[in-house]
Amino acid sequence: MAPASLADEQLGPSVWGVSDGRAGNAAQVRAVMRALSSTGRRMQIAHIAGAGHRETPIVLTPRAPWTLLPGGSWPMPLAALSKDQRSLFQPPFPDVWIAAGRRSAPYTARIRELSGGRTLTVQILDPKTSADKFDLLVVPQHDDVSGANVIQTVGSPSHFAADHIETTGQAFADLADEQGKSCIVILGGDSKAHRFTAAAADRLEAQLTALAQQKWRLRITASRRTPVEIIARFRAFADKVGARFWSGPQDGPNPYLAWLLYSDAAIVTEDSANMLSDAAWHGLPIHIARLEGSSPKFDRLHESLISRGCARWFDGTLSQWQYPPLREADRVADAIMEKLIARHPQPALKGVKDQSVVLPDWLE
């Protein structure tokens, strides 16, 4: 496979992100990679000489019948991949491997074996197999998985890089000049647990109509899972009440981050841990909009966000309150950094003997 995003030399450890191609899984991998590459953490692990760093996640697409088996019992998992994808599993192996999704788990375990344990392996989301196969297992608290090497997160590990925030803020600076209160409305869609039915759309549209009449500026965005008929419906609604609407490139540059930055509140449908976590990362008052269906796992997610003060159920009214932003990707990145430093201790600084010299935190 042509390593288009492969850098042979870089400052610090080499990191590979891996996903199974699902957008939500890839987003969590990118979030942890971005958090790990923040300036403060990068300086603490800059002494680790890595090779073969990849800036963007690798997509592994195993085929049947392997994909029909439990994640912990795939015989010869490399045989499930294409020739190009199999070619990735050869030296030099990365210092850190960060993967998400059940179908990536057999390859996380395999890279650990092939590297002789040198690669620090991080698996995100419940792989439905033993946590002992990974150096770190990162799972949502609502999945109810525990262990010595398990990090439980509230929601998903979201992260927005400072430079991305700055450039987005500048590109959409006109939003800062708008008068009155604004609300981002994030629409999900059908999933195993929830369905975006016509009845749910009726209820939400009526509630948004009332908010528009109260002079709330609405910014509505759809996701990849939003049914086409729901997209069409809320696009027409936005035109009718003067709201903004975005569902893809045909609507112009993606304003998702800008709307998170420049909104006073958020309405998020209940079906997506990632979307709820994005709003919580920004500290927005989250109003969870109900769809049809439920699951014990999502019930626990909603309760954890509500108990932390991040969210409330949406009843048609918008409130504003404050809470510490939810920065779970940073917590995961800190755990990765600590394990890296334990494996690769920072070198002593020659010539620094004066105990009165106070070093920056990242040099201590």
Predicted regions and their residues:
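Catalytic binding pocket for nucleotide-activated donors in carbohydrate/polymer assembly enzymes
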Residues: N274-P324
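Short, structured helix-loop element that forms part of the nucleotide-activated donor/catalytic region
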Residues: R225-A238
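Leloir-type glycosyltransferase catalytic cores
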Residues: E303-E364
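Conserved catalytic-core segment of nucleotide-activated headgroup transferases in glycan assembly
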Residues: D190-A222, T226-P227
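A nucleotide-sugar donor-handling region in carbohydrate enzymes
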Residues: A131-T197, F314-L326, D330
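Donor nucleotide-activated moiety binding/catalytic core segment of transferases
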Residues: R235-N274
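Short internal beta-strands
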Residues: V138-V139, L218-R224, H287-R290
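Active-site and donor-binding regions of nucleotide-sugar-utilizing enzymes
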Residues: G17-V18, R22-I151
